[in-house]
Swiss-Prot record:
Compositional bias (Low complexity): 294-314, 325-341, 527-536
Record's keyword annotation contains Metal-binding: no
Provenance organism: Gallus gallus
Keywords carried by this UniProt record: Cell membrane, Disulfide bond, EGF-like domain, Glycoprotein, Growth factor, Immunoglobulin domain, Membrane, Secreted, Transmembrane, Transmembrane helix
Any GO BP: cell differentiation
Residue ranges of every copy of the Ig-like C2-type domain listed in the record: 29-123
GO molecular function: chemorepellent activity; ErbB-3 class receptor binding; growth factor activity; integrin binding; protein tyrosine kinase activator activity; transcription coregulator activity
InterPro entries: EGF-like_dom, Ig-like_dom, Ig-like_dom_sf, Ig-like_fold, Ig_I-set, Ig_sub, Ig_sub2, Neuregulin
Compositionally biased tracts (Basic residues): 504-514
Identification of the protein by name: Pro-neuregulin-1, membrane-bound isoform
Comment field on protein domains: The cytoplasmic domain may be involved in the regulation of trafficking and proteolytic processing. Regulation of the proteolytic processing involves initial intracellular domain dimerization.
Family named by the database record: Belongs to the neuregulin family.
Membrane-crossing segments per the record: 207-229
Disulfide bonds: C49-C105, C141-C155, C149-C169, C171-C180
Length: 602
C-alpha cells in the first residue's frame, strides 16, 4: 500500500485587523508631541494635537497657561474647528503679543488620558534685539513681577539666552498698551450712555404724553356725562310743560265744544224770593216746598254779580167821581238778596219759592222760622224788626206809604179801580248784562194770602155776571210819565259793614203812572234778605203792628187792598187774555177783599 506523509502545518504570525482593533480597545490613547512655534505679530499660527492611533469616542481639550479655552473666554482671533477622529487643531489669526504662551492639548477616553504641550512665541518686528543664534521661550512672570501689568493684565517673561529677559502684558479686551494702561471702551460707553439718557428722556416724554391724553379723555367723559344729565333734566321739564300746555289746550277745546262756560250765567228767570242765609245747616226736610212760577217783565238788567237787588211792586189804583179824585197807592216791596259775603260763612241757602197768580209757596214761613232759630246772624240784618221799625218811623219819609182817598165823598163801594190803572214799577235788577229783555220774576206769597185769594176767587165768580155794577164803573184816568223818588234812611240804622251798592246805576227809570201820582221805591241792603216775622201767629202780627204803628193805623183799607192787588197783578201776568176786565169785576173783587182781610197786614 502506498502511504503519504504530510509535512507539519505552518501558521502566519501577522496580526489581523480584528486583532489590531481589539488591541486598540484595550490600550489608552497616546498623543504625538507638538512643536514650539514662534511667529511675528499679525501672522497666523496653527497648533495640532494628534493621536498615534485611531480611537473611537475621543475628547480633546485645549488649555492656555493651564486654563481651558472655551467659547466664553477664548479671544476673538482664536478658533477651534470641529474635532476629527484622530486630531484637533487650534487656529490663531493675526497673532498678538497676548497670544504668546504655553498651550496644552489633552485627550481622554474610557481607557485613559494623555496630554502634550507646546510654547508659542510672538515676536515684535519693531523691537531691536541683539540676539544671536539661540532659542527663546515665554514663561509667566514671578509673583514680584506680576505688578508690571495693570488693569487685570497677565505678565509674561520672554527668555532669550543671549539677551536679558523682557516682560510682556496680555491685556483684557477693553484695555490696551504695554502695561494695559489704556481703556479702549471708555469712549464707546460714554457714547452709549448718552444714547441711553436720550432714550430715557424720550421714554419719559412718551409716558407723560400718554398720561396727559388719558387724563384729558377722562375729563371729557365726565363733562359729557354731566351735560347729558343736565340736558335730560331740562328735557324732562320741557316735556312736562308741553304736556301741561297740551292738557290745558285740550280742556279749552273741550270747553269750547261743550259751549261757553260762565261761572255765573244770567238766569233765565229772575227769581224773587225771601232768601235768608243762615249760619246753621238747613235740613232737607224744610227745603221740600212747592214752587209756582209767574213772569214779570223787567226794564233792564245791569250785571251778573250776586249783589243785592230790590224789586218794588207798586200797583196804583185811581178812580174819579165827577169833580173829585181819590188816590189809593199801595206799595208792596219784595226784597231779593243773594249775598256773597254771608254765603262765605253759612251753609246752603234757604229754599227758593215761585208764585203764580193763584197760589204761592210756603217757603217764606220756613225762612222766617229758621231766622228765629239763628238770631245772631239775623240781628244786624237790614230786614230785622228794629231796622223795619226805624225805616217806617213817621218822622222820616216812609218807603211804604199808604194814602186815604182824597175825597171823603167817594164811598168804599165805588172805589173800584180800572184795570188800566194797575201798573207795576220794577227798578233795575242786578242780574244780567243784557239790556231791555224780559225775564219772569218770582214773588213769594204767604199761605194766609193764598187762603184769602181762594175766598176772593169764589166771590169773584159770584160777582162776575152781576149787571148792577156796570153803571157804577169808573173810567180810566189819564196817564203821564213821572220819575221815581228815592227815600232816605237815617244814618244810625245803616249797617256797620260795607255800604250797599245801588243797583239802579244812577238811572231813574220812568214808569207810566195813573193820574199823575208817583210810585215809591225802597232800596235795601244786599247782605241779608229775610223778614222779621218767624211764624204765622197773631202775636207776631200784633208785635209787628206795634213796631210799625202807622202801617196798621194810618189806612187799614189800603192795607186790605194789598192781597187783591197782588192777586190781580199775578192773574194778569199769567193769563193775558183776562188782562182787561169790567169795572164791576174790580169793584166786586175790592169789596170781597175789604170784607175778608184783617186790618193788620204787612
Amino acid at each position: 500500500m502506498w502511504a503519504t506523509s504530510e509535512g507539519p502545518l505552518q501558521y502566519s504570525l501577522a496580526p489581523t485587523q480584528t486583532d489590531v482593533n481589539s488591541s486598540y480597545n484595550t490600550v489608552p490613547p497616546k498623543l504625538k508631541e507638538m512643536k514650539n512655534q514662534e511667529v511675528a505679530v499679525g501672522q497666523k499660527l496653527v497648533l495640532r494635537c494628534e493621536t498615534t492611533s485611531e480611537y473611537p469616542a475621543l475628547r480633546f481639550k485645549w488649555l492656555k497657561n493651564g486654563k481651558e479655552i472655551t467659547k466664553k473666554n477664548r479671544p476673538e482671533n482664536v478658533k477651534i474647528p470641529k474635532k476629527q477622529k484622530k486630531y484637533s487643531e487650534l487656529h490663531i489669526y493675526r497673532a498678538t503679543l497676548a497670544d504668546a504662551g504655553e498651550y496644552a492639548c489633552r485627550v481622554s477616553s474610557k481607557l485613559g488620558n494623555d496630554s502634550t504641550k507646546a510654547s508659542v512665541i510672538i515676536t515684535d518686528t519693531n523691537a531691536t534685539s541683539t540676539s544671536t543664534t539661540g532659542t527663546s521661550h515665554l514663561t509667566k512672570c514671578d509673583i514680584k513681577q506680576k505688578a508690571f501689568c495693570v488693569n487685570g493684565g497677565e505678565c509674561y517673561m520672554v527668555k532669550d539666552l543671549p539677551n536679558p529677559p523682557r516682560y510682556l502684558c496680555r491685556c483684557p479686551n477693553e484695555f490696551t498698551g504695554d502695561r494695559c494702561q489704556n481703556y479702549v471702551m471708555a469712549s464707546f460707553y460714554k457714547h452709549l450712555g448718552i444714547e441711553f439718557m436720550e432714550a430715557e428722556e424720550l421714554y419719559q416724554k412718551r409716558v407723560l404724553t400718554i398720561t396727559g391724553i388719558c387724563i384729558a379723555l377722562l375729563v371729557v367723559g365726565i363733562m359729557c356725562v354731566v351735560a347729558y344729565c343736565k340736558t335730560k333734566k331740562q328735557r324732562k321739564k320741557l316735556h312736562d310743560r308741553l304736556r301741561q300746555s297740551l292738557r290745558s289746550e285740550r280742556n279749552n277745546v273741550m270747553n269750547m265744544a261743550n259751549g261757553p262756560h260762565h261761572p255765573n250765567p244770567p238766569p233765565d228767570n229772575v227769581q224773587l224770593v225771601n232768601q235768608y242765609v243762615s249760619k246753621n245747616i238747613i235740613s232737607s226736610e224744610r227745603v221740600v216746598e212747592r214752587e209756582t212760577e209767574t213772569s214779570f217783565s223787567t226794564s233792564h238788567y245791569t250785571s251778573t254779580t250776586h249783589h243785592s237787588m230790590t224789586v218794588t211792586q207798586t200797583p196804583s189804583h185811581s178812580w174819579s167821581n165827577g169833580h173829585t179824585e181819590s188816590i189809593l197807592s199801595e206799595s208792596h216791596s219784595v226784597l231779593v238778596s243773594s249775598s256773597v259775603e254771608n254765603s262765605r260763612h253759612t251753609s246752603p241757602t234757604g229754599p227758593r219759592g215761585r208764585l203764580n197768580g193763584i197760589g204761592g209757596p210756603r217757603e217764606g214761613n220756613s225762612f222766617l222760622r229758621h231766622a228765629r232759630e239763628t238770631p245772631d246772624s239775623y240781628r244786624d240784618s237790614p230786614h230785622s224788626e228794629r231796622y223795619v221799625s226805624a225805616m217806617t218811623t213817621p218822622a222820616r219819609m216812609s218807603p211804604v206809604d199808604f194814602h186815604t182817598p182824597t175825597s171823603p165823598k167817594s164811598p168804599p163801594s165805588e172805589m173800584s179801580p180800572p184795570v188800566s190803572s194797575l201798573t207795576i214799577s220794577i227798578p233795575s235788577v242786578a242780574v244780567s248784562p243784557f239790556m231791555d229783555e224780559e225775564r219772569p220774576l218770582l214773588l213769594v206769597t204767604p199761605p194766609r194770602l193764598r187762603e184769602k185769594y181762594d175766598n176772593h176767587l169764589q166771590q169773584f165768580n159770584s160777582f162776575h155776571n152781576n149787571p148792577t155794577h156796570e153803571s157804577n164803573s169808573l173810567p180810566p184816568s189819564p196817564l203821564r210819565i213821572v220819575e221815581d223818588e228815592e227815600y232816605e234812611t237815617t244814618q244810625e240804622y245803616e249797617p256797620a259793614q260795607e255800604p250797599p251798592k245801588k243797583l239802579t246805576n244812577s238811572r231813574r227809570v220812568k214808569r207810566t203812572k195813573p193820574n199823575g201820582h208817583i210810585s215809591s221805591r225802597v232800596e235795601v241792603d244786599s247782605d241779608t234778605s229775610s223778614q222779621s216775622t218767624s211764624s204765622e201767629s197773631e202775636t207776631e202780627d200784633e208785635r209787628i203792628g206795634e213796631d210799625t204803628p202807622f202801617l196798621s193805623i194810618q189806612n187799614p183799607m189800603a192795607t186790605s187792598l194789598e192781597p187783591a192787588a197782588a192777586y190781580r197783578l199775578a192773574e194778569n201776568r199769567t193769563n193775558p187774555a183776562n188782562r182787561f176786565s169790567t169795572p164791576e169785576e174790580l169793584q166786586a173783587r175790592l169789596s170781597s177783599v175789604i170784607a175778608n182781610q184783617d186790618p193788620i197786614a204787612v
